[in-house]
Amino acid sequence: MADLSTSVAGIRLENPLMLASGILDENGYTMLDVMNNGAAAVVTKSIGMEERNGYSAPVIVEYGDSLINAVGLSNPGIDNFAEEIRIAKRSGKPVIGSVFASDAESFVNLGRKMQEYGCDAVELNLSCPHVKGFGLEVGSDPDLVEDIVNEMKSKISVPVFAKLSPNVSDIIEIAKAAEKADAYVLINTVKAMKIDIRARMPVLTNAYGGLSGPAIKPVGVRYVYEVKKETGKDIIGVGGITTYEDAVEYIMAGASAVQIGTALYTVGKSVFRNIISQMNTFMDDEKFHSIQDMVGVAIR
C-alpha cells in the first residue's frame, strides 16, 4: 500500500486532501465532520476584522458542474471565531485560518488572532475576485503583496500561505513578491458572469463572481506547473478537483497537497474517501510508493 502522507511547509498531512476555504468551514462542527469524512486538514472561511453580511441573494449560480459565486466575504468577524477554531481543533488534524484585509496591519492583526486561537497556519486571501477593496485588488499589487507577506512573516510564528489569483497579468511576478510565504495556494476562482437572457440582466446580485469547479481545473494545473517550475516552493493546488485523476494532475504539476471545495456541493463529503481509495490503487498500479514520488514529475 502506498504512503499517502505528505507535508506542506513542515505541516504533516495524513493524505494530500484538504477542505478549501469557502464551504462547510464557518462552523467548528461542520469542519470536524469534513475531517471525520477523510479530509486531512481544513481551511476556514475567510475571516475579516469585522462581521460582514456579504451580498444579498442570489449569490451562487450553477454553471454545468461548476459554480459562479459572489457571496461577498460574509463572515462573523475575527473576535467571534475563536470557538469555531477550538471545536475544529478537536480533530487533532491541522486547521488553517483564512484571513482577508485591505492592508498589512489588518492582515497581521488577523494572523495573530488565528495563531492565538490555535491555527496551524494562516492562509492569506489575496485573490477574492468580487469584493472591492479586498482580495484581488490587494493581490494584484506586487508591492502591497510583498509588504503584507513580509509583515506577516515577521509577526507570527506559524507558517504563512499566500493564496494567489489567476486574474492577474503575470502570476510569477506576484508569486515572487510573496516569496517569503511558506507556501503558495493556487488558484482562487476565475472572475466570471452569467446572464439571464429572459430577464436581460446578470443572474448574481453583484453581477459578476468567481468561477470554481471543473471548468477552471486546466487553468489551476497550468499555474501550479508554472509557479513550481519557477520557484520550487511548496504549493497547494486548488480548482476543480472532483476525482483522483484531478488530484494526481495537480500533484504531478508540482502540488504537495490539494484543496477541494466545489465538489462538496456537487458530490458531497464522500469525495474525500473516494479520492483517497482510488488514488491509493492508482499509486500501487503505477509503482508510486509515496505522494512525494509524484510531486512535480510532469515538469519539463
From Swiss-Prot:
PROSITE patterns: DHODEHASE_1 (PS00911), DHODEHASE_2 (PS00912). Substrate binds at K45, N69, A70, V71, G72, L73, N125, N188, T189. The keyword Hydrolase does not apply. Pfam families: DHO_dh (PF01180). Its main location: cytoplasm. It is found in: Cytoplasm. Binds 1 FMN per subunit. Catalyzes the conversion of dihydroorotate to orotate with NAD(+) as electron acceptor. Belongs to the dihydroorotate dehydrogenase family. Type 1 subfamily. This is Dihydroorotate dehydrogenase B (NAD(+)), catalytic subunit.
